[in-house]
Amino acid sequence: MLKKEDRAMGYVENIEELIEGLKFDENGLIPCVVQQHDTGEVLMVAWMNRESIKLTVETKTTWFWSRSRHELWNKGAISGNIQQVIELYSDCDNDTLLAKVDSPGPACHTGSRTCFFNKLV
């Protein structure tokens, strides 16, 4: 059982229970919006499965499921720009996640700080 101060630090007592309340798509995936915790800047959107959520909660770093490579990946593990998870939320329908992170460098594979740089309107 976790102590009160552990819960206040964001530790999760039962990861399975947390995951069971989420709504995954037919492929077992759920979208996750990644946001810089202190500025509110939206950095990227990626997909998570049950295992990547567990790893994210356990390691306090972002883990995602690559739909193209069909494998788990720890964001920033290769570039060194590992995203530290500050908070993780689900939306009102429990079908989308929001990870508030501290992202030390570019979040986009193009080298841009954010993946959202193609202004449409």
Model-derived regions: residue spans:
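C-terminal binding/interaction regions
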Residues: 2-29, 36-43, 48-121
